[in-house]
Design a protein with these regions (language model features):
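Core transmembrane helices of Major Facilitator Superfamily
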Residues: 73-84, 110-111, 315-326
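Extracytoplasmic gate region of multi-pass secondary transporters
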Residues: 202-270, 327, 353-359
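Conserved MFS/SLC helix-loop-helix module at the cytosolic interface between two early adjacent transmembrane helices
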Residues: 24-64
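C-terminal transmembrane helical hairpin of 12-TM major facilitator-type secondary transporters
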Residues: 276-326
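Central mid-sequence intracellular linker of multi-pass
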Residues: 94-108, 128-206, 374
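Extracellular/lumenal inter-transmembrane loop segments of multi-pass membrane transporters
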Residues: 1-12, 55-67, 74-78, 89-99, ...
């Protein structure tokens, strides 16, 4: 793609930064809209909207088009994760939320594995006029997302007590007794969830009260820092593997083990966090995992095999992902619906800020995560 668009690695970095900046600024407004109209309405709108832009990436001709589509994608995708967390909080207790969120991120990484196989196939396609196969990949991914968004628009219920509908069945998914059980179990776990209904807007006064809740600030700080160690490797693994001498086709397949390790770590560490009622110490363990691998990448011989670097990079990308655990802490410690609405968005804004920092570690086409001596 870089060659087709006449771009350098620095241009790609700029595009990533644009995406995360617009994503960051869209987080809180998107969450406030979701709280106002309901996540069951807003999430499908987001998905359909960004799927159109994602598909339009198939037609970009230069880096200006790349920058424009990255900006639009950031604006439309921003807030999707907090919106999803808000929606899930209607259904699950605080101790049930982490593992459900881990399933959410498992599906995200599973799509990365599927995309790697698709990329392997599509990148073999190149028209006689020089059209790259990556264009077909973007078009297909946008189409799939759009179809899922359309299904979600008719399938997502507003709450456990509002599952009846034309496409969900006139009697809904649960009987009245089951609905009472579902609502009572959630409210007994966190009575504050009964303070606002699912289509009640957060007023400016409530927004300010949530923002100045200093008990949440340390969690925001965690969001700003904990992902930086492996962000460069995660974002630029394909470019890095190509710089190590692997072909474009093999590069896509060689990223798959990282996603598999990631999924295993995500599920295991999230389960352990609830099994032993421990969360932040697991986060420390994840950082130690990254530190050991970063030291290895720093001290490895310059003439080391490309396969050795590949193993270290894959293990770094697959580091224990405690995002689901920390997000659940944010929701659990919120203490009110307004704070939960705002805090999940602010936490994710900090995560996007950390992505901006991490993505700009690489500045010259050779990733600092693999060749620190540069």
């Amino acid at each position: 793609m870089l060659d087709d668009l006449g771009m350098t690695t620095n241009d790609y970095n700029t595009g990533q930064t644009i995406f995360y900046l617009t994503f960051l600024f869209a987080e809180l407004p998107s969450q406030l809209i979701s709280k106002w109209v309901g996540p069951d309405r807003w999430i499908p709108v987001q998905m359909i909207s960004w799927s159109l832009i994602a598909a339009c990436q198939a037609f970009i001709q230069n880096k200006s088009g790349f920058f424009a589509t990255r900006a639009m994608l950031g604006l439309l995708e921003g807030g999707f994760i907090p919106d999803t967390i808000l929606f899930l909080s209607f259904w699950y207790k605080s101790k049930e939320l982490p593992i459900r969120l881990s399933y959410f991120w498992v599906t995200y990484e599973a799509t990365a594995i599927i995309s790697a196989f698709l990329a392997f196939g599509f990148l073999h396609i190149r028209q006689s006029d020089g059209t790259g196969g990556w264009r077909y990949l973007f078009a297909l991914e946008g189409l799939i997302t759009g179809l899922i968004g359309i299904v979600a628009a008719f399938w997502m219920p507003p709450s456990p007590t509002q599952t009846a509908g034309r496409f969900r069945g006139k009697n809904g998914w649960f009987n009245e007794h089951e609905e009472k059980i579902m609502v009572n179990r959630v409210l007994r776990d966190d009575p504050s969830k009964g303070s606002m209904h699912n289509r009640q807007a957060v007023t400016p006064r409530l927004l300010w009260q949530a923002l100045k809740d200093y008990d949440m600030w340390l969690i925001y700080l965690l969001g700003l820092t904990w992902m930086i160690p492996n962000t460069p490797a995660t974002s630029y693994i394909s470019l890095e593997l190509k710089s190590l001498g692997f072909s474009t086709f093999n590069t896509n397949l060689l990223t798959i083990p990282a996603y598999i390790i990631f999924i295993v770590n995500l599920l295991v560490w999230t389960w352990v966090s609830e099994r032993f009622n421990q969360r932040l110490l697991l986060g420390v363990g994840a950082e130690l995992w990254a530190l050991i691998l970063l030291i290895a990448l720093e001290t490895i011989s310059e003439d080391a095999s490309a396969w050795v670097r590949w193993v270290l990079l894959i293990m770094l990308i697959g580091m224990p992902y405690v995002h689901a655990i920390i997000v659940a802490i944010t929701s659990r410690n919120a203490g009110s619906v307004r704070t939960r609405t705002v805090a999940t968005a602010v936490y994710n804004m900090m995560v996007q800020a950390s992505n901006i920092v991490g993505n700009n570690v690489s500045t010259s086409g050779v990733l600092a995560c693999s060749r620190y001596h540069n």
